[in-house]
């Protein structure tokens, strides 16, 4: 298809999954702006083999310097201290490690002086300074 045919088809079918790379949701574009990584480098519809991509977008996608990894958590069990992580990032490394579980320190430390006395204390200090100088 030519670029004109792609745009004509996608203008008429904006909800077609093959056109989502040309017409992404505003939230997808916003994520790309926030992460400073163009959406077409990581957005799944742009990676589809049947995606309708004009030549300029294909050229931009070819410049993406991104390692796209799919990481999924498998069996997560806190009682056995076992964490199974599946990392599909072209690595063949399989690691089995025991993870020690400990509770977070939730000790609450209160200030020595209540904050409501701060303005009164500052006012008293100012009066003392003015009285003696």
Swiss-Prot record:
Entry-linked Pfam families: Pox_G9-A16
Sequence intervals crossing the membrane: 112-132
Key word Protein biosynthesis present: no
Subcellular location: Virion membrane
Topology of this chain in the membrane: Single-pass membrane protein
Membrane topology, Virion surface segments: 1-111
One GO term describing the cellular component: membrane
Record key words, sorted: Fusion of virus membrane with host cell membrane, Fusion of virus membrane with host membrane, Membrane, Signal-anchor, Transmembrane, Transmembrane helix, Viral envelope protein, Viral penetration into host cytoplasm, Virion, Virus entry into host cell
Biological-process GO terms, alphabetical: fusion of virus membrane with host plasma membrane; symbiont entry into host cell
Family that this chain belongs to: Belongs to the orthopoxvirus OPG104 family.
Known role: Envelope protein part of the entry-fusion complex responsible for the virus membrane fusion with host cell membrane during virus entry. Also plays a role in cell-cell fusion (syncytium formation).
Subunit relationships: Part of a stable entry-fusion complex (EFC) which is at least composed of proteins OPG143, OPG147, OPG155, OPG086, OPG094, OPG107, OPG104, and OPG099. Formation of the viral membrane is necessary for the assembly of the complex.
Protein name: Protein OPG104
The species this protein was found in: Variola virus (isolate Human/India/Ind3/1967) (VARV)
